[in-house]
C-alpha cells in the first residue's frame, strides 16, 4: 500500500482520535510524517513524535530507559509506595527481555546455552535498575548500561573477586538488583564472564555516535502518554543502512510490551484504540513473539496493519508456520499491484476461492450438430487476472464478507489538500555523559557509611529497656 493509498485512511483515523504508530522506509516516511504530522498536530490536536534513524539530528528522542527512570524518581520521593517500585522493576524487565531476545528467539530455543541467556536477562535488568537509581539524570540511558557492563568485566583490586561481585557486595542484601543478578552472581567465574559477554554482544549494536543523540536524552512521547492521549509516533527506517533496522524491530517490541503493561493497569484493555501501521514488516529483523502479538493484540484494543511486498518476506523471517499464523490472524486483507513474476498472486488467487460457471462445446457436422454443456469450477480470479489488474485496483477480503474488487483513488480526488509540512528542526550536537562504575561504587560506599554512622548512634540498650526486641 503506497503513501497515496494511506492518506485517506489517516484522515479518518485522526477524526476518530485513534492513536497511531507508523513505521516506514525512508521515501514513504517523507510523505507520511511531513504531511500528516502537520495535519495531526495542527488540526486534530495530536502529540507527534518522529524517530528518524536516517537523520538523527532531525529526530525526537527515544530514551529506552525513560519509564524506568520516571518511576524510579517517583519512588525516591516516597519510598513507602511499593507500586512505584514494582513499575520500575517491570519496565526494566521489559527492556532486558526485548534486548536479549531481539533476534526473535526465546531462551528455550538456545538449548544448553539457555542458562546464559536467562542469566543475561536477569543481569541486564539488574544493571538497568542500578543505572536508574544511582546515576545522575544525564547518565541514565542504554549506552550507559553498555559502559557499566563493560566496566564490570575489568579485574577488581580485591583478589579472588571480579568487579561485578565487588559492586554487588556493596548493595544491601534485600536490593532487587542483587536478586535479579543472582544466577550470574552465584556461578563460576568463567560462566559469569560469559553472561556479561552475552549482554555486551547484544548492546554492541547501540554504539553509534549519531544514534546516541536519539537514545541518550529525553523522550518526546512515552507509551503512557501515547496510550492516554491522542498521539502519533513515526519511525523512519533508512532502507540503505541495515545496521539500524534492528532498532525499528526493538522499538516495536518494547512499545508493544509497554502497551500491554499499561493495558493491564486499565483492566486489560486500552481505553483509546491504537493502530500500528507496520510498513516493511517483512524486511526488518524478526519481532519476537510476533505470532502472539497478532493473535492477542485485538483483545487489548490494538490493531496492526502489516504492509508487505511479498508473502515470502514473512516466511523468511518467521518460517512457514509463523507466517501462516500471522496471515490467519489478519481480519482484512487488501492486495493488488502484483509484479509479473509474483508467487504471492498465486496464493491470493487460491485464497479468493472458486466459483461455478457454465462451460461447454458446440460441434457441427453435416448431419449431426451437437452441443455439450456442463458446470465447472474455476478460480474467482486467476493468477493472470490478478497480475493484470489496472493500477489503483485492489481486492479486499474481509472476515464474514464476500471478496470485493475496489478502486482506491489518489488522495487528491477525495478533495484532500496538504497545506503545510511538519518540519523537524535540526538539533545541536549534545555531549553524551556515561555512567562510571567507580562513581557508582563511591555512591554505594557513601550510602553504606551513612547507614553505619546512624547505627552507631542508636542507643540499643534504651530501646531494649523500652520493651522492644532488638536482633
Show which residues each predicted segment covers:
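Methionine residue identity
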Residues: 1-2, 6
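Cationic, low-complexity basic patches in intrinsically disordered or flexible, solvent-exposed regions
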Residues: 8-10
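Intrinsically disordered, low-complexity segments enriched in serine/threonine/proline/glycine
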Residues: 20-22
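P-loop NTPase motor domains
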Residues: 24, 28-302, 317-320, 384-405, ...
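Conserved ATP-driven motor cores of ASCE-family P-loop NTPases powering translocation/secretion/packaging/pilus
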Residues: 294-395
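Short, surface-exposed polybasic-aromatic patches that bind anionic ligands, especially phosphate groups
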Residues: 409
Amino acid at each position: 500500500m503506497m503513501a497515496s493509498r494511506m492518506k485517506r485512511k489517516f484522515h479518518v483515523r485522526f477524526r476518530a482520535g485513534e492513536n497511531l504508530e507508523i513505521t516506514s522506509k525512508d521515501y514513504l516516511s517523507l510523505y507520511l510524517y511531513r504531511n500528516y504530522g502537520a495535519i495531526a498536530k495542527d488540526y486534530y490536536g495530536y502529540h507527534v513524535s518522529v524517530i528518524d534513524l536516517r537523520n538523527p539530528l532531525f529526530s525526537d528522542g527515544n530514551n529506552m530507559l525513560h519509564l524506568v527512570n520516571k518511576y524510579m524518581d517517583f519512588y525516591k520521593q516516597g519510598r513507602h509506595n511499593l507500586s512505584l517500585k514494582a513499575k520500575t522493576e517491570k519496565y526494566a524487565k521489559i527492556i532486558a527481555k526485548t534486548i536479549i531476545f531481539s533476534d526473535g528467539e526465546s531462551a528455550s530455543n538456545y538449548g544448553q546455552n539457555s542458562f546464559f541467556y536467562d542469566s543475561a536477562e536477569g543481569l541486564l535488568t539488574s544493571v538497568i535498575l542500578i543505572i536508574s537509581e544511582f546515576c545522575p539524570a544525564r547518565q541514565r540511558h542504554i549506552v550507559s548500561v553498555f559502559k557499566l557492563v563493560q566496566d564490570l568485566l575489568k579485574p577488581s583490586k580485591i583478589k579472588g573477586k571480579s568487579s561485578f561481585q565487588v559492586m554487588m557486595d556493596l548493595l544491601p542484601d534485600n536490593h532487587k538488583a542483587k536478586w535479579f543478578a543472582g544466577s550470574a552472581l552465584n556461578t563460576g567465574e568463567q560462566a559469569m564472564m560469559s553472561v556479561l559477554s552475552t549482554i555486551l554482544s547484544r548492546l554492541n549494536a547501540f554504539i553509534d555516535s549519531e544514534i546516541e543523540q536519539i537514545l541518550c536524552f529525553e523522550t518526546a512521547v512515552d507509551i503512557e502518554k501515547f496510550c492516554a492521549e491522542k498521539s502519533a509516533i513515526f519511525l523512519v527506517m533508512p532502507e540503505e543502512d541495515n545496521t539500524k533496522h534492528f532498532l525499528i524491530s526493538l522499538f516495536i517490541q518494547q512499545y508493544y510490551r509497554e502497551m500491554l503493561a499499561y493495558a493491564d493497569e486499565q483492566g486489560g484493555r486500552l481505553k483509546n484504540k491504537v493502530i500500528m501501521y507496520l510498513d516493511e514488516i517483512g524486511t526488518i529483523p524478526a519481532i519476537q513473539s510476533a505470532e502472539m502479538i497478532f493473535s492477542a493484540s485485538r483483545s487489548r484494543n490494538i490493531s496492526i496493519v502489516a504492509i508487505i511486498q511479498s508473502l515470502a518476506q514473512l516466511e523468511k523471517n518467521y518460517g512457514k508456520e509463523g507466517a501462516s499464523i500471522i496471515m490467519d490472524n489478519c481480519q482484512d486483507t487488501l492486495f493488488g499491484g502484483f509484479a509479473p513474476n509474483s508467487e504471492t498472486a498465486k496464493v491470493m488467487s487460491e485464497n479468493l476461492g472458486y466459483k461455478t460457471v457454465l462451460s461447454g462445446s458446440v460441434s457441427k457436422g453435416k448431419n449431426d450438430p451437437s452441443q455439450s454443456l456442463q458446470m465447472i469450477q474455476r478460480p474467482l480470479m486467476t493468477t493472470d487476472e490478478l497480475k493484470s489488474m489496472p493500477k489503483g485496483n485492489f481486492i479486499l477480503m474481509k472476515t464474514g464478507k464476500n471478496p470485493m474488487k475496489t478502486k482506491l483513488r489518489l488522495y487528491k480526488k477525495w478533495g484532500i489538500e496538504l497545506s503545510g509540512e511538519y518540519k523537524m528542526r535540526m538539533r545541536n550536537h549534545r555531549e553524551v555523559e556515561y555512567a562510571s562504575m567507580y562513581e557508582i561504587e563511591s555512591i554505594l560506599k557513601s550510602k553504606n557509611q551513612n547507614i553505619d554512622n546512624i547505627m552507631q548512634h542508636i542507643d540499643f540498650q534504651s530501646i531494649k529497656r523500652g520493651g522492644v526486641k532488638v536482633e
